[in-house]
Amino acid sequence: VPESFQKLIRDCKIGNVILFRRNIQSAEQLRELCVFLHCLISLETGLPPMILLDEEGGTVSRLGELGSVSPSAMAQGAAGDPENAFQVGRMLGQELRAVGVNFNCAPILDCNTNPKNPVIGVRSFGGDPEKVADFGAAYARGLREAGVIACGKHFPGHGDTETDSHLGLPVVN
């Protein structure tokens, strides 16, 4: 961890950190990084830190080959049983906890309602709001059972846009 970032944590009392693929080299390195951050943040703030990762499973996996291959949310939704989403959430949660991550930026709670949407697609449990809610809640329960906080995303309606939100501002009419 760069000294400049450690100083930022000390001076600004930063309590939460999000990690990206570029921060991950191996399971052992990630575990050591999370332990270091946990100790530093706890010491400097007196609070337990949240160490975040964006690990949806399916096509969005920051763990990459370090984690298990899991079905996309759309595949889970197509299978028709929210228990599958619970099991995937729990499995991913266990893998995240094993390396020290305690907060997951998942599941996707948006509905995939526009076939021209370049972002949501198979990352959504489907196009029906009730189905997406049921599967998303099951996935989140699986994460929680593994000791990981779930954070549903994206902004409601994103699944009905035609713009990649990483490249431009999506608009829903």
Model-derived features with residue positions:
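Enzymes and membrane/adaptor proteins characterized by extended Gly/Ser/Thr/Asp/Glu-rich
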Residues: C12-V132, H154, G159-N173
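Preference for extracellular/luminal or secreted protein segments
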Residues: V1-G15
